[in-house]
Each structure stands twice: as C-alpha cells, then as structure tokens.
C-alpha cells in the first residue's frame, strides 16, 4: 500500500474510529489530511500532530490525495466524495482501511452490541502490561494512553469491530471476541434478528482455520450461533458450563469488582484472584473476555492480574468527573457514560447501585436516534423506571428524520404513566448542565448518558459549579 498511495484524506476525520486510523497512518509515514463539519478536541489534537485539518467540506480539500476514506456518517452527496469519484480517486469505507492496517499485524477484533470499547481497551492494557506494545484502534479514549489509537512496535493490533453497518465483515483477525448480540442497528439487517446473527457468524469465519472465537456463554444471542461456527470456540461468563468463568463475584464500595477466575479450556490452569478497577457485573464479563484472549496468547498471569487491577478506564464509559458541591449544600457525584441502548443503561444503573449503595441515582439521558427510540421504546421506559430520578432531553437525531411518538416528550409521558418515576423533560440539551447544577441534592449520583451531544454536559456542569463556588 505504501508504494502506491502516499497521501490519504479522511472525510469525517473527527469521528472516534476515523481519527484513530488517521493517526496511525500518519505515524506510519503517510501524508494524511482530513475534514470534519466542526472543529473539536479530536481535530485539534490531530492538527497538533501535523495532520492538515479542514473545517467544513469542500472539493478542494482532496487536492493531492490518492485515496479518500469515509466514515459511516458521510453521505454520497458530500462534495469531497463527489470530487474524489469524479477524479477516479479510490473512496474506501473506514473499515476497509482498518482491514488494511490489520494486514500488517496479527489482529485481535472485539465485536458485540455492547462492551466493545471497554473490552478492546482492557485487552490492549493487558498486552501492554505484558510488554507486547500493541497497536490499537478503539472507539473511545483509553485514559492510560490519552488517545484512542497508537502505533505499537509489537506483533498485535487490537481493534473494535463495528457491526452497526456490517462493516466488520471487512476485517480479517486471527482472534475474535463477541461480547453479546442484541437487536440494535436493525435497519442494516432488514429488521431481521436472524440476519444480524448470521453476520456475526460470517465475521467469525473471516478468521483463518487456526483462529479462535472467544464468546460470551452467558448471552443467549451468542449461544445460539455457537453450533454454526467452524472455528475453535472458547466461552466465558458466570455460568457453570463456560471455559473461563468468574465465581465469588463481589461488588466493592467505590466501584471495583472482585472475583475468582477459573480457566478450564482443555487443561486446568491456576485460578486468578482478580480485583477489577471497574464497576458492574457487565465489566466482569468484559474482563473475562480479556483473560480468555490473554490465556489463548499464553501470556503470564502476573500482567493479566496487574493490568485489570490498575485499569484507568475509557473516556465516556462510566467516567467519573468527581464529587461537586450542591447548590443546597453537600456534594453530588458526577458520572458520564456513552450508553444509548436499554441493555447498556440497565448495566450502568446496576453498576452504579453496586458502587454507590443506598444513594439516590439521577439519570440524565439524551436518546440517540429516532429509530432506536422507536424500536426499544418499552425497554427504555422499563429500565429508566429503575432510576430514582430522570432528566430527559430530546432525541439526538444522528441524521435521522423525526418519528411520531418516538421522541423525548413521548418517553417522558410514558414514564409518567408507568408511575415509577416522575421525569423532568429538558427540551434543549444545552440547558441540561444548569438543571443538573441547580437541582442535584447531597448524596446524589448523577449519570449523564447518551451517544450524542450530551457528551459535553459533564464538563459544563463542572464549569457552572466552579463559577458558583
């Protein structure tokens, strides 16, 4: 690739997956440029690295490029895409470029509806702790590295495999993890759950015959595809019939999990006593997937235990913003999370209950996509009803047209009718920081959750609280 193409341009370079690939290609010696609709922390960081960044989209931005990479969010009518095609410059999806990077190393791909980013980060951290210096491309910022990607000198590349547009079928890993399979992004699969599951089977069969499928045995969707897989399978979970199992699971106050890991994959290996620096049973399963990967790679036990104990988290995955003064006295705890599906929401609420027992849980949620709100409406109502207080904003459209009865006000009404919690609807997400800063009570645990613009809310809450002090 290097001999044929020297200048690569990214359209939508500010996206989590795009920016990571752009940075790695830059570090490999390519000339990299990119454009995005708006300037932000990610684009500014890329510019500081020496990557030429354009704000806005214009045909002139692709000048000199020999390949153009597009994110899923970029449409065919983008002027840079149109200009590239007119000039017969190859236009390739992000996943195709990621697949090219994976050809340079032995690839470990983490797939699944939920938990991909955290599991990818955990695997990366364990490999780094073992001295393997992996390359990684993650959908969120790995706090210990301060970035969502890095070019390592070792033999492995660890990547997050995205099923949302079926682009993970471009990847060719040697080890693959599937954390779970839930009904999400169903427009891609014709609203057919069987088609979604078949895509995961195809993904696993992209591995060579000597690859291994590391699968969550606790998840019904994953279990249902095991008979269709013709690669070696390693299962993990909390159930009795898995090969990498957690027993004696205890939630520790403050947000850690303690458990014993039993490994029974053909040979019986020593049990591992794990203290995981993440909250929630869902995090235990992500750690088990990581242990299964590390065991398959025959890594020593010490770096596995050490990396899990000191894992410093991922941006916007149960990310703690600290304890802050309430307007009426006392302090509240502020947490940020990317979760945008009812299953993720339930896991985060359960994790918060375990980490902060007895405290009032306030969920500030910005729904993401009208189609997901429609498809998961009743599940959202049920799960949100398990919080103690709810702040709801309007749906973040992500380019979708509004759908009747699948908006924030409809969710608010449905929650009110259900009667478990009386939600407050905040029409403009920009008003949410002030609402949180003014209304949080002493002892509250406030979780700002969603995949849209709510990601900027915690920082603004902190600013407002500091201004008030």
From Swiss-Prot:
* Gene Ontology molecular-function annotations: ATP binding; UDP-N-acetylmuramate-L-alanine ligase activity
Q: According to its UniProt record, in which pathway does this protein act?
A: Cell wall biogenesis; peptidoglycan biosynthesis
Q: Which domain of life is it from?
A: Bacteria
Q: Which GO terms describe its cellular component?
A: cytoplasm
List the InterPro entries: Mur-like_cat_sf, Mur_ligase_C, Mur_ligase_C_dom_sf, Mur_ligase_cen, Mur_ligase_N, MurCDEF_pg_biosynth, UDP-N-AcMur_Ala_ligase_MurC
Which amino acid positions bind ATP, per UniProt?
Answer: 112-118
Output the SUPFAM superfamilies linked to this UniProt entry: MurCD N-terminal domain, MurD-like peptide ligases, catalytic domain, MurD-like peptide ligases, peptide-binding domain
The record lists its disulfide bonds as none
What does the record give as the reaction this protein catalyses? UDP-N-acetyl-alpha-D-muramate + L-alanine + ATP = UDP-N-acetyl-alpha-D-muramoyl-L-alanine + ADP + phosphate + H(+)
Coarsely, its chief localization is cytoplasm
One matching Pfam family is: Mur_ligase_C
Might you name a Gene Ontology BP term for this protein? cell division
Enzyme Commission number: 6.3.2.8
User: Which keywords fit this entry according to its UniProt record?
Assistant: ATP-binding, Cell cycle, Cell division, Cell shape, Cell wall biogenesis/degradation, Cytoplasm, Ligase, Nucleotide-binding, Peptidoglycan synthesis
Cellular localization per UniProt = Cytoplasm
Q: What's the family?
A: Belongs to the MurCDEF family.
* Described purpose of this protein according to its UniProt entry: Cell wall formation.
PANTHER family recorded: UDP-N-ACETYLMURAMATE--L-ALANINE LIGASE, UDP-N-ACETYLMURAMATE--L-ALANINE LIGASE-RELATED
What is the protein's given name? UDP-N-acetylmuramate--L-alanine ligase
Q: Which organism is it from?
A: Leptothrix cholodnii (strain ATCC 51168 / LMG 8142 / SP-6) (Leptothrix discophora (strain SP-6))
